């Protein structure tokens, strides 16, 4: 069998707020590698990430490739596909409007208002038709305080805006932005994802190296692991098994 760990990412309750306020992707990747070390992982370990977890696992695999046997990313594609979409795909720019809105201080108040109704709106758009009351409540609990909400918005500000970037991570940041994971990589994307369009995933497939695979999950939106858990789990287990030798 497998031993699995599912951590809360930095800044999401119940984790503490990072003292230096660093939420850049290199910081997320470094956290993942530190967790591997803390748990006593070896080179057979597999790293899996969804949404913000996806660039975190790509970065972890790039920075310390000896730690990870294979990589699984979901809902945010690798291989430069997102950067290309922001430049050449206006439909995706429109879908990603919230990322630009989050650069403004007003977003702290708007997102936090009315029992975080902003989150309900995003879920409705990203996974249309999926009833997720319990999952949404759990998500809201991780950003229920102003401090934790500001931390999560800090991810977007460090990526696209003027958010803090730790100078000590400059070299690591350049690597995670400019390189690709060398390990075998499985990328999964929901066919009804309203956050990132399937055309972005298909573009990623054209950029994928020979040791990678892209799968579009039928009947699923952005939160495919909740919407189609049996399909997603089967694909992941089969991928891990096929790359175990």
Regions found by a protein language model. Give the residues of each.
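Flexible "cap/lid" subdomain of the alpha/beta-hydrolase fold that forms the substrate-access gate
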Residues: 5, 12-48, 52-212, 216, ...
């Amino acid at each position: 069998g497998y031993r699995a760990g599912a951590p809360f990412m930095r800044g999401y309750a119940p984790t503490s707020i990072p003292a230096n306020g660093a939420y850049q992707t290199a910081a997320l990747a470094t956290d993942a590698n530190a967790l591997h070390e803390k748990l006593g992982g070896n080179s057979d370990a597999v790293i899996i990430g969804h949404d913000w977890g996806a660039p975190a696992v790509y970065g972890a695999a790039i920075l310390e490739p000896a730690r990870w046997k294979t990589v699984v990313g979901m809902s945010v594609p690798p291989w430069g596909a997102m950067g290309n979409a922001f430049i050449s795909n206006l439909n995706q720019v429109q879908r990603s409007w919230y990322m630009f809105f989050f650069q403004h201080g007003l977003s702290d108040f708007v997102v936090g208002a009315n029992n975080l109704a902003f989150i309900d709106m995003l879920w409705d758009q990203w996974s249309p038709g999926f009833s997720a009351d319990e999952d949404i409540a759990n998500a809201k609990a991780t950003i229920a305080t102003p401090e934790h909400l500001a931390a999560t918005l800090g991810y977007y500000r460090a990526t696209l805006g003027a958010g803090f970037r730790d100078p000590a991570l400059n070299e690591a940041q350049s690597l995670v932005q400019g390189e690709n994971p060398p390990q075998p990589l499985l990328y999964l994307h929901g066919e009804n994802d309203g956050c990132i369009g399937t055309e972005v995933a298909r573009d990623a497939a054209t950029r994928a190296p020979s040791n990678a695979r892209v799968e579009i999950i039928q009947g699923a939106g952005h939160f495919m692991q909740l919407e189609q858990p049996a399909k997603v789990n089967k694909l992941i287990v089969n991928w891990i098994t096929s790359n175990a030798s």
